[in-house]
Design a protein with these regions (language model features):
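A generic structural signal for short, non-catalytic loop/turn and secondary-structure boundary residues
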Residues: 67-69, 91, 112, 163
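Amphipathic, positively biased hydrophobic alpha-helical segments used for protein targeting
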Residues: 25-26, 53, 92, 101, ...
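Short aromatic/basic micro-patch
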Residues: 36, 92, 144
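Low-complexity, intrinsically disordered regions enriched in charged/polar residues
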Residues: 56, 60, 65, 92, ...
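Radical SAM [4Fe-4S] cluster-binding motif and immediate context
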Residues: 96-196
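A short, sequence-level motif marking secondary-structure junctions
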Residues: 88-95
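Glycine-rich beta-alpha loop elements in corrinoid/cobalamin-binding modules
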Residues: 1-88
Length: 196
């Protein structure tokens, strides 16, 4: 439907649920109508797509320019039909380099009482569970946001959230496994005691 309404649009998917081997990736591209897949963490690959898109002067040129060559951190279906990968370091080691979507105000409009806020305190998983896509070697290094960053987000959220919101989602793969997680729990408890 998207391409019917916008034939020059680019279909971009991303996330961890992508085959690790190239033959399976080719089959994935045959099965689904996508142009670009951004594996693992998305900030670098998606930023590279946006940077290339900003160089396009008209919507009619979008597909031609963006899909003309590979994009660092992405797997792309090029204009000639080839599936190509340009590898880059898609994992950000210092997660605090990523601006907070909360403290920058980007998520303020979603504090409407309909949604629950979600935070992430670390990325990666040290385990290699065969049933889990996150058990791969590419994400077994744990990278963490600093406790200060998480605390700042929690306090910001507590000042913005509506009184009918009773949940906070933590999207870590293994929250509670690291000593700093207790500090985060203490901050949550402190905020609850103050706000309730």
């Amino acid at each position: 439907i998207f391409l019917e309404k916008n034939p020059n649009g680019i279909v971009v998917w991303g996330g961890p649920n992508f085959p690790p081997d190239f033959p399976s990736q080719l089959n994935y591209f045959k099965k689904f109508p996508l142009d670009i897949y951004v594996p693992i963490e998305g900030e670098i690959g998606f930023s590279n797509i946006v940077e290339r898109g900003l160089k396009v002067s008209s919507n009619s040129e979008l597909r031609k320019i963006i899909l003309n060559s590979t994009i660092p951190g992405c797997i792309s279906r090029l204009n000639n039909g080839e599936i190509k990968t340009e590898f880059s370091e898609n994992r950000i080691k210092n997660l605090d380099e990523i601006p907070s979507p909360y403290t920058t105000g980007l998520l303020d409009e979603f504090f409407d009482g309909k949604l629950s806020p979600m935070i992430q305190t670390n990325r990666g998983c040290p385990f290699s569970c065969t049933f889990c896509v996150d058990g791969s070697d590419s994400v077994n290094q744990i990278n963490q946001f600093t406790t200060k960053r998480v605390s700042d987000e929690l306090h910001y959220i507590s000042n913005k959230v509506k009184s009918n919101t009773h949940s906070l989602l933590i999207s870590d793969l293994n929250f509670g496994m690291y000593p700093k997680d207790m500090e985060i729990c203490d901050t949550i408890q402190e905020i609850q005691n103050k706000k309730n």
